[in-house]
Amino acid sequence: MNYVRIFLILWCAALPDALAGTEPLLYETQSFTLDNESTPVRVPKGYTLEWLVDMDRPRMLTFAPNGDLFAGSKSGEVYRLPPPYNKAEVLIDLSGYPHSVAFREGEILIARTNGLYRAPYQPGQTKVSRKEVTLLARLPGGFGHNTRTVGVGPDGRIYVSLGIQRNCTDQYLGEGYDFDDQRGGVMVLREGNGRPTWEPYASGLRNPVGFDWHPQTGVLYATNNGPDHLGFDQPPECFSKLTAGSFHGMPWFQFDGQQVNRDDCESDKPPRPIAEVTIPVVTFPARNAPLGMAFVPKGAMDEKLEFDAVVALHGSWGKPVGGGVETRRAPKLVAVRFKDGEAVRVDDLVSGFQLLDGDRWARPADVAFGPDGALYFS
């Protein structure tokens, strides 16, 4: 039996391969028990949600080549979880919000708000000394959307995503902007000729927390959090295809689900015209706060979900005018379904984290697939 384990602060879910041949997904409601309290959760039929381990405000999840699981955190710890992933060890305690980590041969990369850092690392190593951590490349820092997500692409290069400070801030990854205002997209690190430097890869993304490469096509996709100033229903949240030089419009332009419009909340002249805006491939309802994402690798979950993307929707803090907390967008995991290498629709995967009275017992932040084919989330 194959299992998918899902973390939630962190929790684990075991998912047997019982969905072959079903399209769309079939669901069932199960009783999930946490701290001696039971709550109903909706999962794909045949799948089971389990709790795994507690950590202090874990965020982005990364599996090392040897199968160890790592988690950055808002609390400052970088956690290491060796199989079976039910015990979290502190690899290193750092200031500066170590939101995410990545690996390349002989070293661990740690993305903090103000810079990308590295340290020597060998598989199975249980501790990293602060003295070993050195700055690889400075990042635009400052307040507001201060997470930094790092990943190593299929091309071996290092990519980092970062958001603009507010709903509408004149910040852009490109020429004409000071270094600290080069925010709102994905950058790639140029190495090999002297000091490493950042190059813009994709711009016009307000807060692209999660990104991953499609396993078949090698194309980069990212989630993106839209602004809050246009009400509860606009603009929709984005799941976008990124290409070298692509411009996604924010904060000067917003996609309303049908067309791209000028957003007058930012009066400064846009760095690029509206005709160059790349629209998202699929959207989620506004205020859902999509964060981490990962593509389903071959052999994980059900074969009908292979090469689809799983996205963590964190849920909204805002609510409709006159509505109570029970009307907020509910946290959940969703699957972006792909056909012939292109995104076609969004299906729920796991829901039930928000109760009928609006109380929440979990808000997914990131997702990652383990070497066991299991799906983990924080």
Tell me what each language-model feature is.
Residues 68-71, 107-110, 158-160, 220-222, ...:
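Hydrophobic beta-strand segments that make up the repeating blades of beta-propeller
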Residues 97-98, 114-153, 161, 202:
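Asp-box/WD-like beta-propeller blade repeats and closely related beta-sheet repeat scaffolds
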Residues 59, 78-107:
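Blade-loop segments of beta-propeller domains
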Residues 21-44, 147, 164-176, 181-184, ...:
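Beta-propeller domain segments
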Residues 77-80, 107, 115-117, 185-187, ...:
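A short loop-to-beta-strand structural motif that recurs across blades of beta-propeller domains
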Residues 50-56, 90-95, 135-142, 199-204, ...:
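Surface loop/turn motifs at the tips and blade-to-blade linkers of beta-strand repeat domains
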Residues 55, 64, 104, 151-155, ...:
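Structural WD40 beta-propeller signal
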Residues 61, 101, 150, 208-211, ...:
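Hydrophobic core register within WD40 beta-propeller blades
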